[in-house]
Every structure is written in structure tokens, then in C-alpha cells.
Amino acid sequence: MSAFTPASEVLLRHSDDFEQSRILFAGDLQDDLPARLDTAASRAHTQQFHHWQVLSRQMGDNARFSLVATADDVADCDTLIYYWPKNKPEAQFQLMNLLSLLPVGTDIFVVGENRSGVRSAEQMLADYAPLNKVDSARRCGLYFGRLEKQPVFDANKFWGEYSVDGLTVKTLPGVFSRDGLDVGSQLLLSTLTPHTKGKVLDVGCGAGVLSVAFARHSPKIRLTLCDVSAPAVEASRATLAANSVEGEVFASNVFSEVKGRFDMIISNPPFHDGMQTSLDAAQTLIRGAVRHLNSGGELRIVANAFLPYPDVLDETFGFHEVIAQTGRFKVYRAIMTRQAKKG
């Protein structure tokens, strides 16, 4: 990361104001400004493992990754700079968590793109840290206030759940398909064969719905699930437990923390990172799959039909099949053969 996001560029217009501040950066941290801004001290807290990877290389233990921030994560900070995400419930979870830990009198800055809905920060924080807009540039807004009252934060109150064909799906703010099973995942599930056996890796597992639905019809599969999102990791663990399904769940930037090989890799890969369109994760998934598939193993992914994945699949595996499609989505299948590049 070297290029700054528009939100960071707005903050840099005020860089002189931050030189004496002990800052906690949090929210949608899509660049390394927290590591590079000239401050008295800087910490960062993120729920996104790939953002933590970048920041921790420069900030060490002052960059933290977890679902819920703790008092240690905000220690000695007198200023919060919060990058507004595109998901309002996610912002609510994170801000209530952070403001419950920071001392009264803390300076609060909220910055974000106008299209992300950053304006709603004013209403959200009205009872705790009344905000005023202090800058507007790069289609972003920057808001400032001072913490007057700490909210009471209870992470358990943010859990949600829904049912899919008799399965219980547990969700948290910021998890993909929080309110119900998305159409793409439904299409992918329709292609899975009952009584499948072997080791299955679910990359970008979200709330864990693909894995538990697969396990119900194929109870002998051995499941591993991973996601970059701390809320997704916790939601998947809860979904597995709620349906009495066993599996290993951990945070990983695609394959960064994955060990070993699998008989099948399934995924509904993201193509948005925050407000930005990004095909990086899916391309990393396709290219890296050959290092994590057994001979004869398969990669099966669902994607928006317009996305340019066939070329990457052919380049990596030598061929691919479309095994299901609608007007909007396609399910791609690629098999690990001698033709496949061995990574």
C-alpha cells in the first residue's frame, strides 16, 4: 500500500493538527496512513486481517486485529480517527465498542466517502460525541467532535440469525449475506453433490452457510473455513456450533494462513474491498488454489457473470467448466490435473 485513499488525502490536509496527538486509527483502514502519519503515537485496530497484515509490518504490536477492541488496544490514546465503512451496522458496532473504552474528552474524527453514508455518523454519535463537519474534499466528509459520554457496549446484542432449509445461520455486522442467503451462494449450493467425502476448504466463508449446508448432505467431509473478516470468522464458528457441524475456522488473507492440500475448495469470492471494486482476492484464490489442491481435486466458485475469471482459470488450470448459470451468476469448476500450473 502506498497510494492513499481519498479519505486519507482529506486527513492529510490537517496533518499539522495531529503531530502532538496520540491517535487510535480504526474502521475501514485501506491504506498505511496510520503507519506513516506524523503523530506523538499511533495505534490501529481493525477487523480485517489483510489490513492488519499491512499495518503490523510497520507498526508491530501497535496494530491489532480482533472482533472486539479491548482497553489495551486503545491505551494512552487521546484521539480517535475512524474511517467510515460502507456498512452502517458495522460502523455502529465498532464505534460503540471504541467509545466505550476511550476516556471522556477524547477527540473524535470520522472520515469517509460521501457515497458510503458517512453523514449518518452525526446522528449515530449525537448522544456521545456531537460531530460537526470540518472539511469536505475528494467526495469525502471529515467530522470532528469530543467524547462527552461513553456508551455501554455489549457485543452480544449485535448478533443476528436466520434459517435456511432448517439450518441456523449466525451473523454479525459486516458479514456478507447478513440478512439471508445470497443468490450466488444458492446457485453454488445447488451444484454440490450429496455424500461427497474428503477435505473441503471454504475460502471467504462469511457466516459459514456454504459449509454447514454442504456438511448436512455430506457429513463425512472434513471442513476448514477462512475469511479476512473477524466478524465472519466468529459468525462461522457460531454457525458451525449451532448446527453441530465440526470444522476449523481461522482468519486468513485468501491462502496466507492455510496449510496443506484439499480435495475441494469452494468460494463465493468478494469483488469489493470496502467501497472499491477489487478482483485481487478472487484472482489470488484461483492462482493459489493449485498449491492447495490434491491431484484430482477441484476448485468450485460462483461469481458475477460479467467478471473476467475464465481467462485466469484457463491460464492456471488449463481449462474450466461452467456447471451452472443464471443471468447474473456462473458457477465455475476447475480440476487439478497435470495441465495445471503447480504454483
From Swiss-Prot:
Disulfide bonds: none annotated. It is found in: Cytoplasm. Its EC number is 2.1.1.172. Signal peptide: none annotated. The keyword Transferase applies. One of its GO terms (molecular function) is 16S rRNA (guanine(1207)-N(2))-methyltransferase activity. GO terms for cellular component: cytoplasm. It catalyses: guanosine(1207) in 16S rRNA + S-adenosyl-L-methionine = N(2)-methylguanosine(1207) in 16S rRNA + S-adenosyl-L-homocysteine + H(+). It comes from the Bacteria. Keywords: Cytoplasm, Methyltransferase, rRNA processing, S-adenosyl-L-methionine, Transferase. Specifically methylates the guanine in position 1207 of 16S rRNA in the 30S particle. Belongs to the methyltransferase superfamily. RsmC family. PANTHER family: RIBOSOMAL RNA SMALL SUBUNIT METHYLTRANSFERASE C. Monomer. This is Ribosomal RNA small subunit methyltransferase C. It comes from Escherichia coli O6:H1 (strain CFT073 / ATCC 700928 / UPEC). The gene is rsmC.
